[in-house]
């Protein structure tokens, strides 16, 4: 039993429970209670993908997150793409003008990005109650949907291009393609 417990790795908010179950303390990674779902990707929750892709890839991922944070904090508003995109989203959806947003990556490597952003944005922002418990007076989240642009050209892209309703759409392309 003890030998078996040495081969388990646990990621949990309740590491004390893992210890009671016999998991070696060095094999237990805590999820802090203040880490919300949208940020868990930068926490111990990413242990499985880190092991699958390597620590170097995870370190690069964290460095990318840090560079976006620094760009947001250190760039003037008129040159700040992150801030501008965020403000456009607020104007589009908080005003109730639009109810959905399409995410259209032009790379099959990013085929799951719309699904990830759907979970991230709609779970995080799709609430009718504010942090203080009061009701929100504005629309809180668009319906996020999309797919790889080249695969969608004869499906919903037809509606986006020739339909009667406007849908804010983010097209994601690359200056360099890596295979």
Question: Residue spans of the language-model regions?
Answer:
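Active-site phosphate/pyrophosphate-binding segments
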Residues: 2-179
